[in-house]
């Protein structure tokens, strides 16, 4: 089968840095034990399992503050998605050692929020309800940051915003087209709003790659965890912008061969938190796949994964 390897794809620098920090923590005998990650270090179940194999456990809950209460001692790693000041403060109260793996792009958004709120602004934040990145961003100034995900949320914003200085900003991993559309709706309601688009460069170029390269494919396969917002947005971009059907899979085991019926060329991309070896297995399988040759339909030889985490230096 013809396979188009959509590029760029896969790991971004924030994800790589977060995983390296977590590995270095696991290998550092000077850090207090046990070591926990507060939420998934990046949104990929394979990565979570690999850290569990190294003795680093992931704890999760309805929100980060509640999840933190399950950690009694030792070291806590904060994930790439960022964390609220309340969680930092509670970790200090519990006398936990902290390793902060927050992506620098997320930190920049937090710094922006702090700066404008100090100057008496209200912040409208475009993001996904229930995702840890908006949770952390809203937590920077909960009384002044207003999370919106759809047009209806704009209509429900507090009336007093009309008389306030306002900025609109966003979660770094959203669809850039969705963010632009919502920001336009915000601008219509609040013509005086200041726009600060914080889509990270890695998200933007991966979405643009799908928009530009998927059009001549019959199907696009996005390799990424179901909890990975940026992976889900890549599938959405294929549908909405390139007009090419797309399926997101966590790994090769989730590939339904019936999707390949009548497909001549398939495009493959992957989310920013998807380990490269997992995507490579999908590409390798598809490249040898022949609908007419049943011997090429067996996924088993392509399922073995060895090292999936980036190499690190021991500190």
Curated annotation (Swiss-Prot):
<keyword id="KW-0479">Metal-binding</keyword>
<feature type="binding site">
    <location>
        <position position="172"/>
    </location>
    <ligand>
        <name>(2E)-4-hydroxy-3-methylbut-2-enyl diphosphate</name>
    </ligand>
</feature>
<dbReference type="GO" id="GO:0046872">
    <property type="term" value="F:metal ion binding"/>
</dbReference>
<feature type="binding site">
    <location>
        <position position="81"/>
    </location>
    <ligand>
        <name>dimethylallyl diphosphate</name>
    </ligand>
</feature>
<feature type="binding site">
    <location>
        <position position="273"/>
    </location>
    <ligand>
        <name>dimethylallyl diphosphate</name>
    </ligand>
</feature>
<feature type="binding site">
    <location>
        <position position="43"/>
    </location>
    <ligand>
        <name>isopentenyl diphosphate</name>
    </ligand>
</feature>
<comment type="function">
    <text>Catalyzes the conversion of 1-hydroxy-2-methyl-2-(E)-butenyl 4-diphosphate (HMBPP) into a mixture of isopentenyl diphosphate (IPP) and dimethylallyl diphosphate (DMAPP). Acts in the terminal step of the DOXP/MEP pathway for isoprenoid precursor biosynthesis.</text>
</comment>
<protein>
    <recommendedName>
        <fullName>4-hydroxy-3-methylbut-2-enyl diphosphate reductase</fullName>
        <ecNumber>1.17.7.4</ecNumber>
    </recommendedName>
</protein>
<feature type="binding site">
    <location>
        <position position="43"/>
    </location>
    <ligand>
        <name>dimethylallyl diphosphate</name>
    </ligand>
</feature>
<feature type="binding site">
    <location>
        <position position="131"/>
    </location>
    <ligand>
        <name>dimethylallyl diphosphate</name>
    </ligand>
</feature>
<comment type="pathway">
    <text>Isoprenoid biosynthesis; isopentenyl diphosphate biosynthesis via DXP pathway; isopentenyl diphosphate from 1-deoxy-D-xylulose 5-phosphate: step 6/6.</text>
</comment>
<dbReference type="GO" id="GO:0019288">
    <property type="term" value="P:isopentenyl diphosphate biosynthetic process, methylerythritol 4-phosphate pathway"/>
</dbReference>
<dbReference type="GO" id="GO:0016114">
    <property type="term" value="P:terpenoid biosynthetic process"/>
</dbReference>
<comment type="similarity">
    <text>Belongs to the IspH family.</text>
</comment>
<keyword id="KW-0411">Iron-sulfur</keyword>
<feature type="binding site">
    <location>
        <position position="230"/>
    </location>
    <ligand>
        <name>(2E)-4-hydroxy-3-methylbut-2-enyl diphosphate</name>
    </ligand>
</feature>
<keyword id="KW-0560">Oxidoreductase</keyword>
<dbReference type="GO" id="GO:0051539">
    <property type="term" value="F:4 iron, 4 sulfur cluster binding"/>
</dbReference>
<feature type="binding site">
    <location>
        <position position="43"/>
    </location>
    <ligand>
        <name>(2E)-4-hydroxy-3-methylbut-2-enyl diphosphate</name>
    </ligand>
</feature>
<dbReference type="InterPro" id="IPR003451">
    <property type="entry name" value="LytB/IspH"/>
</dbReference>
<feature type="binding site">
    <location>
        <position position="273"/>
    </location>
    <ligand>
        <name>isopentenyl diphosphate</name>
    </ligand>
</feature>
<feature type="active site" description="Proton donor">
    <location>
        <position position="133"/>
    </location>
</feature>
<feature type="binding site">
    <location>
        <position position="228"/>
    </location>
    <ligand>
        <name>dimethylallyl diphosphate</name>
    </ligand>
</feature>
<comment type="pathway">
    <text>Isoprenoid biosynthesis; dimethylallyl diphosphate biosynthesis; dimethylallyl diphosphate from (2E)-4-hydroxy-3-methylbutenyl diphosphate: step 1/1.</text>
</comment>
<feature type="binding site">
    <location>
        <position position="230"/>
    </location>
    <ligand>
        <name>dimethylallyl diphosphate</name>
    </ligand>
</feature>
<keyword id="KW-0004">4Fe-4S</keyword>
<dbReference type="GO" id="GO:0051745">
    <property type="term" value="F:4-hydroxy-3-methylbut-2-enyl diphosphate reductase activity"/>
</dbReference>
<feature type="binding site">
    <location>
        <position position="228"/>
    </location>
    <ligand>
        <name>(2E)-4-hydroxy-3-methylbut-2-enyl diphosphate</name>
    </ligand>
</feature>
<keyword id="KW-0408">Iron</keyword>
<feature type="binding site">
    <location>
        <position position="103"/>
    </location>
    <ligand>
        <name>[4Fe-4S] cluster</name>
    </ligand>
</feature>
<feature type="binding site">
    <location>
        <position position="273"/>
    </location>
    <ligand>
        <name>(2E)-4-hydroxy-3-methylbut-2-enyl diphosphate</name>
    </ligand>
</feature>
<keyword id="KW-0414">Isoprene biosynthesis</keyword>
<feature type="binding site">
    <location>
        <position position="81"/>
    </location>
    <ligand>
        <name>(2E)-4-hydroxy-3-methylbut-2-enyl diphosphate</name>
    </ligand>
</feature>
<feature type="binding site">
    <location>
        <position position="131"/>
    </location>
    <ligand>
        <name>isopentenyl diphosphate</name>
    </ligand>
</feature>
<feature type="binding site">
    <location>
        <position position="200"/>
    </location>
    <ligand>
        <name>[4Fe-4S] cluster</name>
    </ligand>
</feature>
<feature type="binding site">
    <location>
        <position position="81"/>
    </location>
    <ligand>
        <name>isopentenyl diphosphate</name>
    </ligand>
</feature>
<feature type="binding site">
    <location>
        <position position="230"/>
    </location>
    <ligand>
        <name>isopentenyl diphosphate</name>
    </ligand>
</feature>
<feature type="binding site">
    <location>
        <position position="131"/>
    </location>
    <ligand>
        <name>(2E)-4-hydroxy-3-methylbut-2-enyl diphosphate</name>
    </ligand>
</feature>
<feature type="binding site">
    <location>
        <position position="228"/>
    </location>
    <ligand>
        <name>isopentenyl diphosphate</name>
    </ligand>
</feature>
<dbReference type="GO" id="GO:0050992">
    <property type="term" value="P:dimethylallyl diphosphate biosynthetic process"/>
</dbReference>
<dbReference type="Pfam" id="PF02401">
    <property type="entry name" value="LYTB"/>
</dbReference>
<feature type="binding site">
    <location>
        <position position="12"/>
    </location>
    <ligand>
        <name>[4Fe-4S] cluster</name>
    </ligand>
</feature>
